Amino acid sequence: MKVENRTAALADAVAWTSRVIDARPSNPILAGVKLEAIAGTLQFSAFNYEISARHHIEAGVDEAGSVLVQGKLLADITKSLRSEKTYLVTDGSTLTITSRQVEVHLAAHARHRVPGSARGTGHARPSRCPTFVQAVNQACVAVSREENRPVLTGVRMQFQGDKVVMTSTDRFRLARATFTWTPQNPDVDTTTLVRGSLLKDVARALDEHQNIRLDFDADSPTLLGFENAGRVSTSQLIDGEFPAVDRLFADEYPIQAVVNKQDLLDAISRVALVAERNAPIRM
């Protein structure tokens, strides 16, 4: 492999892809980022059994090829480079990174396999990214941190025609957000359960100036894919039965009040000063 890259684009792509790598991976392969040079692009991919990431940038490819290197180390190295151009060359089990006066040699694996992303019939045309991010932030409010109950750590996503309903609960709170999308199959009716922490991580990494595309197998979903600005994230779905909470959401509420958010938060904070930890506050 012999590739010429723009340093800024290379560093950004490596940083985004390597974010899914665990701090202490159980398998050395899971500590790596796969680089593949082909047809004028340099492709990046990483995986951690729960979420995968794929990205690509334009590059000058003199020799096609692929290699697996330590992702976090590669991210630190590329972030420190200051030259406009960076060159990547493989020679056997070594990746050489050259950028002006800097030359770094990294141990590499030539044989590797990083799982791909979700592919299915339920994917949609691009949707507005800010709308999706807002829905994720609202729906994840009530996600539980109890790892011994995996179902409560997830957000249920119900795809019903052009509507997506996101719900979470930790047994004490409920959160729900709804947004519209444009599915390729207008009659799609599928429910998925995705880990809330992964969903928030995906939302944080999105480019909100670009649209987002969701992808899954509508008949038997096991993965949920998110594509945005050339970046693809895939999340493993949680296998379990989400609590029946729909009846707790009323279609109409007889009493409604519109208040200033900060005023409400300030009032609650003052009252909570004299309340015991986790004690309820009457409103």
Residue ranges with predicted function:
Residues M1-M283:
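Structural preference for solvent-exposed beta-strand-turn elements
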